[in-house]
Amino acid sequence: MRGLAAAAAALGQAPEVGLMVFGDGESPRTDLVIGLALAGGGRAYYLPLGHRYLGAPATLPAALLAGALQPLLGGRKPVHAHDRKAAAHRLARLGLELTAPGEDTDLMSRLLVPTRREHPLSEVARERLGQALPPDPTEGARRGTGGREGAEVEGIAAWAGPEAAVLPALAEALAGALEAARLAPLYRDVERPLVPVLLDMERAGIAVDSAAMGAMSAEFGAAMDELTRRLTEAAGHPFNVASTRELGKVLFEELRLPVIKKLKTGPSTDVEVLEKLAEQHPLPGLVLEHRSLAKLKGTYVDALPLLIDPADGRIHTTFHQAGAATGRLSSVDPNLQNIPVRTELSRRIRAAFVAPPGRRLVSADYSQIELRILAHYSADPALLESFRIGEDVHTRTAAETFGVAAAAVTPDQRRVAKVLNFGIAYGLSAFGLSQRLDMPPREAQGIIDRYFARYAGVKRWLESIVAEARRAGEVRTVFGRLRPMPEITARNPALRQAAERTAVNTPIQGTAADVVKVAMLKVHRALAGERLDARMLLQVHDELVVEAAEGAVEKVSALLRREMEASASLAVPLRVEVGHGRSWAEAH
């Protein structure tokens, strides 16, 4: 006990502190906290909290821990961590709140090297400081069946202390690197303040109607059984629809349907192939229905209820702040960003994400944000005009591309224009367009040529951004986010062409990601500032989902539209569509 007080007193005299909090798993919100290391003023301390072996030290009482450390963790002195969000989750389980200022060296490193997946502290320290840290003594055990809780305190302390001690110097080095790379404003104004926002969202979670999921599971299972019966009838015998080998035998040997695409392992039975074969025989269509139901049932309907936290009846995802090289957030355990929405069946899954009694879900979604960013970058007069006057941009594109009046545009022409508008920024080729629209490549090339003839500004920008990427070896977003492009000059044509497509879509997708992150900051601050009974729960691509008291829905809706539309100053206005309801499906 005296040792804890002495450590807290010594750290209180240090100008800045390094902090590492260690758990026994990969889920900071729920795993067992093994211990924490603190370092400052040339001294490092390790506090064992969850070691479980014969002779292990007793866990410190929570009240004692809070009394000694909360003044430090909640004070004005910088407390640096490698992944502050994970550290804050684990500290909260000990009754501690990390609100002190400080850097997140993991996040800083990810901004500097966005294409690298992992940024372990040992590698970042070696790269930025030339300093070797001791290896994790439990790494081998954690890959097997063991864990950190069984490791002896001395071994963990010898590793944990240097990890905490390196953080102040590492934070300084990374801050200098961010300045040199012109990334400091993005880190300081967007990424670092977003950490506590995401922390709050992960803690909040979203309510799920497990009874509705259970009913859906039974219904989907019965529908799959009926489809299996019809498949058996169509084939003339039972077969395993999930086996590509058995399915291929039925399709191509027994039914003698044409082989459309060949793989090394045999004829393909992918979605594209089955859709074409369904025009000739009912069995492929039944397979598609069965696959769709199996995917929905296995991935969502049956899996999601198992992830509901029994303590609050809610699902808590984990957001990766730098989950993609473009800067987009990603969601894991579970991934709530890919909950399907296109079909009526998949919308029923969203209907199981609900608000508690007396509350509503409010969804706010940017309208065509990537197209608006393309208009901003390209300064194409036709695109700019479409967004400034608020006309249907796909109808305008169809009219321009096919040379007809807007009132004469057919649904098929608008569909082609929509594919063009969303595909051009991703390097859509004539072959790709022909595949999507089931037309000859020559006809598709003609459509693309007519598009670029009418939208010359877009073509010029596409060419200029690739040229700039080749010259600078990098591309940036409107907010300055960096993505290195080393393969833009590769000799291998496939690598080079892929890099050229990335050079085009990164400024657009990355700027959209930045806009959404700024919007999250603005919405979070505004909700707190106006003291509304509401909290942000999810970010899904260009959409924010907020849970609000019924009486606050109108104010929250207006706040979302106001703050989100003001999150960036582009050459065209940002527009946000807002809805609300008892479920996510009703709200969006």
Q: What are the functions of these language-model segments?
A:
Residues L72, R76-R84, L361-S363:
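Acidic beta-strand-to-loop metal/phosphate-binding motif
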